[in-house]
Amino acid sequence: LASKLASENIKDKPVISGCIGPFSLAGRLYDMSEIMVAIYIEPDAMLQLLTKCTEFLIKYVRALKDTGASGVIIAEPASGLLGKDNDFTVILHNCGNSGQCTDAMIKSGARALHFGNAISMADTLKECPSDILVMGNLDPVRVFKQGTAISVKEETLKLLEITANHPNFVISSGCDIPPHTPEENIRTFIETVEIYNNSPQTPTGGF
């Protein structure tokens, strides 16, 4: 309903919906500690569970598309617990990724990849193809919730300057904005990005 209402009332900006990824969903259904053991001792059963979770999420994402949403962010935080040798095919957003999952994310075929604040965005952009949108990765707690308007502006400009030569970069929070985050901090982030984008010094194609 929220996606439908947003799509009906917001016409000048893309409306992006969100959902959890198949491995994170499976972990919540099966228990995260249990599934980390089960992927080794019961791989066939876990594959079946992941398949069912994936099938459900495909239907859910299609339903979101039918509401008029421009796209969907699939958050897959639990995949940060996996090593690079654990082969799962859907990895789009990963709060815990410290670099070991980046290659798997690129190979997923997603049109956009969203990274948490645990990674270096400058280093990650060097690994990502220029035709894939790369998003992230301001710390949602330290910067948005615990920071001040001044520090939010400073951190936002710092990341924009670091990534200025990558036109496929879209600045955002590294994960969900926590409850009770000061509204002033969110507004400051948006205003800072808008001013930067309208600056004559901003490289062509920047976000």
Identify the meaning behind each predicted range.
Residues 1-207:
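Active-site loop segments of alpha/beta catalytic cores
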